[in-house]
């Protein structure tokens, strides 16, 4: 497969590696971008936290809650200008509130009735596109609910009540004091916003993700030239560290790095007055995994001048 300049550029942006290293990585992996990232990591040239690449979609994240149930939605727009528009912000809040009455899936939210218009959310967004003059889409949504407990929420970079660039839900099961439970839940939600854990517990991490990390660690360890039995111990140690870093409960608590999140929750049980279980987390970062289409600015100006 021919390695193009655009492919090299994309890999450089995702990894921070040099141009020649990126070109070699793509050649070695037959142009497979993810495999090329792993190749660079195995050589110690790229770090895992660079893999996600750039995010560039505009819009807002909206959150709505009702104690033991909460939802988070992402509505994208083409420009940040529209995201600052009062009508758009009200639309995001409204869709989040409508989502509370559904199972939280995009399909269910889209079909639900939007009270202010009497139409479906999908048709209401279409009407908003015509009114505001810019394309919009309900891209993602998530819902968490517990029978006895709270779903704490947190919005980072808030643009107003319940809307912002990053939204987090943390579901806590407990029969204890709900106000105290929500307080620790909000702290954990802020932690999730900052650290982006892959799962609540290490046992819940996608086996494919864990296997991929193990393979990278094996290649890195082999470069040391040590015997296989030593390499196996090195890899096991790195995997333990990996799980500690990406599983919520084993992470160092942002509010107090001297204790884990699990220890902080255990400590909070004293004020809550009952055991606490983390039932789930949801984290939506605006535009995550979306890249704006690159454009030629000079060509845009020329086209505008002709128009």
Swiss-Prot record:
Q: Give coiled-coil spans as residue ranges.
A: none
In terms of superkingdom, the source organism counts as Bacteria
- Annotated protein name in UniProt: Elongation factor Ts
| Keyword Protein biosynthesis in annotation | yes
Q: What does this protein do?
A: Associates with the EF-Tu.GDP complex and induces the exchange of GDP to GTP. It remains bound to the aminoacyl-tRNA.EF-Tu.GTP complex up to the GTP hydrolysis stage on the ribosome.
Q: Where in the cell is it found?
A: Cytoplasm
User: Which region ranges are annotated with the description Involved in Mg(2+) ion dislocation from EF-Tu?
Assistant: 79-82
Q: Which organism is it from?
A: Sinorhizobium medicae (strain WSM419) (Ensifer medicae)
What protein family does this chain belong to? Belongs to the EF-Ts family.
Where is it found, in Gene Ontology cellular component terms?
Answer: cytoplasm
Q: Which GO terms describe its molecular function?
A: translation elongation factor activity
Q: Which HAMAP family match?
A: EF_Ts
Return the CDD domains for the record.
Answer: UBA_EF-Ts
Per UniProt, the keywords (alphabetical) are: Cytoplasm, Elongation factor, Protein biosynthesis
Q: Which Pfam families match?
A: EF_TS
């Amino acid at each position: 497969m021919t390695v193009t300049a655009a492919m090299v550029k994309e890999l450089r942006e995702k990894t921070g590696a040099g141009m020649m290293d990126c070109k070699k990585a793509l050649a070695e992996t037959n142009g497979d971008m993810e495999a090329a990232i792993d190749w660079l990591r195995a050589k110690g040239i790229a770090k895992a936290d660079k893999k996600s690449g750039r995010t560039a979609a505009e819009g807002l994240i909206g959150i709505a809650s009702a104690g033991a149930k909460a939802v988070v939605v992402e509505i994208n727009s083409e420009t940040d200008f529209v995201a600052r528009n009062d009508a758009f912000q009200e639309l995001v809040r409204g869709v989040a509130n409508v989502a509370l009455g559904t199972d939280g899936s995009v399909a269910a939210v889209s079909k639900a009735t939007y009270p202010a218009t009497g139409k479906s959310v999908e048709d209401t967004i279409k009407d908003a596109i015509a009114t505001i003059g810019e394309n919009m889409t309900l891209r993602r949504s998530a819902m968490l609910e517990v029978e006895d407990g709270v779903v704490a929420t947190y919005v980072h970079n808030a643009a107003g009540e319940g809307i912002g660039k990053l939204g987090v839900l943390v579901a806590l099961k407990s029969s204890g004091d709900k106000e105290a439970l929500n307080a620790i839940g909000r702290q954990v939600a802020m932690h999730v916003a900052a650290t982006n854990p892959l799962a609540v517990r290490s046992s819940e991490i996608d086996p494919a993700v864990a296997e991929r990390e193990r393979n990278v660690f094996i290649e890195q360890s082999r470069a040391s030239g040590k015997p296989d039995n030593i390499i196996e111990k090195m890899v096991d140690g790195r995997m333990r560290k990996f799980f500690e870093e990406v599983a919520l409960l084993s992470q160092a608590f942002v509010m107090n790095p001297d204790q884990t999140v699990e220890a902080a929750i255990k400590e909070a049980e004293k004020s809550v007055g009952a055991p606490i279980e983390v039932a789930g987390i949801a984290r939506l970062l605006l535009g995550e995994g979306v890249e704006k289409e690159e454009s030629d600015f000079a060509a845009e100006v020329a086209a505008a001048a002709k128009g």
